[in-house]
Amino acid sequence: MLYQRLAYYNMQWYAGSPHLRCLNVGKPDRPTYLPLEVCQLVPLQRYKKSLSTMQRSKLVEGSRQKPLDRKLSLSRALRDNNYDSEPMLRECGISIAREFMQVEGRVLQAPQLSAARDRELYTPNGRWNFNKDRFIQPIKVKTWGAVNFSARCNVRDLVKRLIQAGIMKGIQMEDCAADVIEEMHQMKWETPAKRVEDVFQQIKSSFKQQKPGFLLCVLPEKNSDIYGLWKRKCLAEHGIVTQCVVPPANIKDQYLTNVLLKINAKLGGLNSLLKNETTRAIPLVSKAQTIIFGMDVSHGSPGSNVPSVAAVVSSLGWPLISKYRASVRTQAPRKEIIDYLFKQVGDDDQGLIKESLIDFLNNSKGQPPEQIIIFRDGVSEGQFNMVLTDELTKITEACKFFGSKHFGGKWFPKFTVIIAQKNHHTRFFLPNERNRNEVNNVQPGTVVDKGICHPRNYDFYMCAHAGMIGTTRPTHYHVLHDDIGFSPDDLQELVHNLSYVYQRSTTAISIVAPIYYAHHAAAQVAKFTRLDDMSETSSSHASQAEPAPVPELPRLHPDVASSMFFC
């Protein structure tokens, strides 16, 4: 970017450098350019914005420790700090042991997974693959196309290989070589909005009157500015399921399988099922119609005034617990408690819970759920009471309102509320004589519910996944409310099962799938709109007496609203 030299800079700074690039210190839509030679970078500033994918990767890589290394460093810290010599602790009668606390735990048996033709997927160490198996419910993709925003990818070759890999997994994809749309070279220097709009004009011309059922989108890089605008165009404006990819230079079969896992789930298929789903052997859940909610709130970076995004994910098709849908809303910045679970407007409810219940009825022959299980992420212990008095109350009101509209006020479901926490410092280490696995982490399926848990309330720790790098961090589950009446064993089995139904992966995950899906749904829909612009709008109202209105996100098109678009 060139800058115009003023007389001041001619006299005070380098007169022979008019072509140096400038530093943009303004907003994306209001740039402010400063000459580089007059700027200084102040050291030791805290960076508050989101890190890039590469930065996050380097941060995690630099901070991870293998279990034995972490255990040794903790032992060394206890010894070197000599907490027992602290006068205040001694005065209070508090002593800190230098040895790790021994606690009892048990390892749950991994649930059985089924692929096509009732073949069992082998799950050693919480991992499996589809090398010789097909997806249990593969989809047919008839009308679809591919869009290329990247100059480095041979999209036609990618499409050909994807179709071949799909055949191996049971997915029937028609050849769309004629419907590969390349971005015109001259558009690469335009704004992301113009680039997306131009490509969609080509799509309309290519498909004439028939809307494609699926679009594969090849992006030039991760975290591309095109991503959010493309998703909004497809999901909100046109109702087209889409999968964005940034293919590596050397595309391997496993990469294609991972892409197909997402495509199949987004288009309504299922990759695998728990055997006890189909045999109705999940304790309590398989005995009565049950809906499972996953709820999460995504916030902007610290210090920003960006609206928070709340997502509610709910299960479809009882007795299955593997298929979900999502609803998303914005709310006040940094607010953790979800606002729009129940929102009565006149004689109607426009809240998140109603949308979930309607889709559940449509997939259960009009029968309402008798049991509602709620998994909530992202709240601290100081907010537990607010979850019960605010969120559970709103969900109860939404169900009561829904029951009065559809079932004559004679529907009274039972509720169970469970909080999942990952942001804690508890770690488990195997005793030395039992360090037999490759990285010395606890085995997947490890549960601890004694010794370090609350003396009165019901909580437990679970390591459902296999920690292959670094030290496994368990998820801490707190049961705040339980009308259904789960026994500890039954609830732990349900949580363990829900760690194996994450359709976009072939590994057990560290937290139940509904919560992971809620996180993905909030993050993806938030990118529909430039939230930086929302932040500026909110800031412009900050000095006014009345609070700034929270901008709403675009609603999903009806054709994709019930899909697993977030997968």
Language-model region placement:
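Long, low-complexity, intrinsically disordered terminal regions
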Residues: 1-567
